[in-house]
Regions:
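Mid-to-C-terminal alpha-helical segments outside catalytic/metal-binding sites
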Residues: 2-32, 36-54, 79-96, 265-266, ...
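Alpha-helical scaffolding within the catalytic cores
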Residues: 81-85, 108, 133-136, 187-188, ...
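Catalytic pocket-lining loop regions of alpha/beta-barrel enzymes
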Residues: 158-270, 278
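Active-site gating/metal-coordination segments in enzymes
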Residues: 35-39, 104-195, 235-247
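Conserved, mostly hydrophobic/aromatic
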Residues: 59, 112, 171, 234, ...
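Alpha-helical scaffold segments that flank or form the walls of functional sites
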Residues: 71-119
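Hydrophobic faces of well-ordered beta-strands that scaffold small-molecule active sites
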Residues: 56-60, 97-100, 125-127, 149-151, ...
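Di-metal (Zn2+ and/or Mg2+/Mn2+) metal-binding site signature of metallo-dependent hydrolases
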Residues: 54-68
């Protein structure tokens, strides 16, 4: 009887451990490292940096082949789902999300809005619209969690430069911002236009400041000037886009990120840029843990880190 009792208890303990492991993304016989493996991302280790509660990933995209690709699309990545993304959240420790409609879908924001509905109150959306959008549609988008519009003039498609100022005036009344994805040289060329915009500006991916000039490039000064005037924010994201050095330190683009955060920590937000759509080969995708760890050098103290990951996103996107 004693043996039977011991065996039953052992079975219960083992079954319970297996259930807990499965709930946490582990299985018996599966390595701890594999628990952090994320689709469309390289590496499998957890980041060294511990994310504070309510940390926000302010730049990512969803892809879903149930929705039509825009005729003008130059990027056509594979599916990247909410289920996939939740594995990334588990890996890096973020809980809030800003979904950016990618150029792949033109002005079709349905993939982003559907994902936001699944993620719930922890998600916001930056939409893509053109000059045919109605005021009623803008108001509808606001009720669905949209807090800004994006102009991607790197992967050109649904929007164009002549739409920026008129649409900025319209969305300003909704309390939205205008997100700009342009190369550094483009930003310098339209500096006067940017100064005229009534809505706040959010610059994608470190402002795409070119390397190897980095902070010596005129675009850095243009962006920082707008930040200093309280007119702009910067996403310290996408360190892999313009690097000439590469991982793990991304020393050249990291210098830009560090400079931006030091100059104006109250106007910086961070984003993963998952699933890294400009990197077409799955095997070449960046390691998201390494990208997240860069913040240890850019925001080296706990107060600054909390600003970048929690407080600033709450202000910019309206998280409570």
């Amino acid at each position: 009887m004693k043996t039977e009792k011991f065996d039953r208890r052992t079975f219960i303990r083992t079954a319970g451990a297996a259930a807990l492991a499965a709930a946490g993304g582990l299985s018996l016989g599966k390595s701890h490292a594999d628990a952090y493996r994320v689709p469309i991302s390289s590496g499998s280790a957890a980041p060294k940096l511990k994310a504070p509660a309510n940390a926000c990933d302010c730049h990512m995209h969803f892809y879903d082949d149930r929705f039509p690709v825009a005729a003008s699309a130059t990027l056509r990545p594979p599916n990247a789902t909410v289920e996939d993304y939740r594995l990334l959240q588990k890996r890096i420790g973020t809980s809030r999300t800003v979904i950016v409609t990618p150029s792949t879908y033109g002005t079709d924001n349905r993939p982003s809005l559907e994902a936001a509905a699944i993620l719930g109150p922890s998600a916001r959306v930056v939409a893509v619209v053109d000059d045919t959008v109605t005021d009623a549609e803008l108001k509808r988008l606001a009720t669905l969690g949209v807090r800004g519009i994006r102009f991607n003039l790197v992967q050109k498609g649904a929007t164009s430069l002549d739409m920026v100022e008129p649409l900025a005036k319209r969305v300003h009344d909704l309390g939205w911002h205008v997100q700009i994805h342009m190369l550094g040289d483009q930003i310098v060329q339209i500096a006067d236009l940017l100064l005229r915009l009534p809505a706040p500006i959010v610059f994608d991916h470190l402002g795409r400041v070119p390397q190897p000039m980095g902070v010596d490039h005129p675009s850095y000064g243009v962006i920082l000037g707008l930040v200093d005037k309280g007119r702009a924010w910067v996403k310290v994201s996408g360190a892999y886009h313009d690097t000439k050095v590469g991982p793990p330190d991304y020393a050249d683009t990291s210098a830009v990120g560090r400079a931006f955060v030091k100059a104006a920590p109250e106007r910086m937000v961070w984003g993963s840029d998952w699933p890294h759509p400009t990197v077409k080969e799955i095997a070449s995708k960046p390691d998201d843990a390494i990208l997240f760890n860069l913040l240890t050098g850019w925001a080296p103290d706990e107060s600054t880190l909390r600003r970048v990951l929690v407080d600033n996103p709450a202000t910019l996107y309206g998280f409570e």
